[in-house]
Amino acid sequence: IDLEEVTSNIKIGRMTGLIQGSLKNFTMEYGQPSRFDLVITSDRSRKVPQAISVDAIKNLSIISTGSETISDILNSGLNRFFSQYPYSEIGIRCTLSDDLFSLRGLIREGGKEYLIRRSTFRGIDMVNQNPDNSISFKDMSERMGRLFQPRQQSKDVPSG
């Protein structure tokens, strides 16, 4: 799956690269998903640029943590001059069972669980800070809904 084609049609933010995945044990009840196991990983079958935009990083942060705290990092120091970052690998597993949604990183290095791993010289790692966390599917749906709402502009508050 070409991420650039997919992300050009949804408001998550621009990503380039190829992914592959599987969806297993998918069931619907009362018009909404009730169970699934989704795995998404980088596809290295062709050499294509792998990059993620700042907007996509912010939106994936909302999905994975429920907050935009990564915005502070992206708007500080040298980071504010970049609109996208290279990455080396994507590894994500989402499961839903008994109304509990779980998001896990499949890349494990140095005791950390990564959803997205930075490239060798530059980039931003997306670390799953709370790997054992599960939330209700309703809460995850609300997080997804927040992606399509206008963001409030942060205001610089003078220190005094």
Predicted segments, located by residue:
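Membrane-proximal interfacial segments on either side of biological membranes
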Residues: 1-160
